Amino acid sequence: MTPLFYAIIFILVLQYTVETVLDYLNAQHYNDPVPDELKDVFDVNDYKKAQAYKKTNYRFGLLTSTFSLVLTLCFLIFGGFEWVDQMVRNVTDHQIAMALLFFGIILIGNDMVTLPFSYYATFVIEEKFGFNKTTKKIFFLDKLKGWLMMALIGGGMLAAIMGFYQLTGPHFWVYAWGLVAIFTIFMNLFYSRLVVPLFNKQTPLEEGSLKSKIEAYAKNVGFELQNIFVIDGSKRSTKANAYFSGFGREKRVTLYDTLINDLEEEEIVAVLAHEVGHYKRKHIVFNLIASLLLTGLTLYILSLFVNNPEVSYAIGVSQASFHAALIGFGILYSPISEITGLILNRLSRKFEYQADDYAKATYAALPLITSLKKLSKNSLSNLTPHPAYVFVHYSHPPLYARISNLKK
């Protein structure tokens, strides 16, 4: 067992400890007095239901995170990675095939082990609180489709990156970065057209009052909008959402059918105005560029360490390899990922305020406020999160902060 092995153990335990403390602090705020501007979000019964939902998820989250830590530590300490590595070496000596088998066994194995937790969360917790609309058929089909996409896309990307590594040595990161950049831009453009239909049905928003109001707003702010779709999110959950995707002719707005059912038309337009604000303020382009730059930085740092056998030995294998080094590096690099995540979350919260301000300036504040309250009520959101939890985990400001900003 090498010093890096113990460093990995330390990182895993530290991350678990920090997350557990943050969850505990957040849970202590569940019973805090609700801010005056949010007292109309829940009635007495809904508030009790929201409290019960949060506490149930807190206890279940603690159980799953503890199980995950124990499983990972046992896998490391008792030679799980070495066992899988030797298994794939007995099947093939081709480096790329070996890596694909190695990651396939670990990822699908992990998914199978944690499947009962996912099943319980969906069919017990979400069902109990009235959110779940997923059938068992959809649940397991989603799993199978996810595995298939992981094999085709993830496996293809891994094989290509390893090919670059074998051909170019330490310069592989440049070519890998180029591949990831092309793929990321492609998915930003065509995600809704190619991936979403595998899981959901999308239909154009029908002619009527809502579509007319959306088109009138878009025209008023100079936002070219030809594609407005409704997605059948209600087949999985009662929770609502809306999102903007694509560029140019592939630009589209997608509204969940639950959103249309839960909100008034003016509130839906206000939500759309918020999404348009992200586009107009260049947040989407910024996030794309930031993601690509961080990916490039990560791949460059990986190239500096992937040839160091100690990075492979850190996960307990006896033979150094690209695939073992990837896992070792991923864990060792995770503290840096946490720091960049904090920075990006801070920027994201700032962008949310800017998008809210844009919606307020170009449409109105009141319908956005009422829509945010309804969405929070319908999802039993936490109205009094701990500031430290917000700082680490929230990509959006808490509801009370957004409403205070909109009322300025």
Regions of interest found by a model, annotated:
Residues 2-320, 335, 339-408:
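Polar-ligand-bearing catalytic/cofactor-coordination segments
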Residues 318, 328-331:
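Alpha-helical transmembrane segments
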Residues 322-325:
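Glycine-rich, flexible loop segments associated with nucleotide phosphate handling
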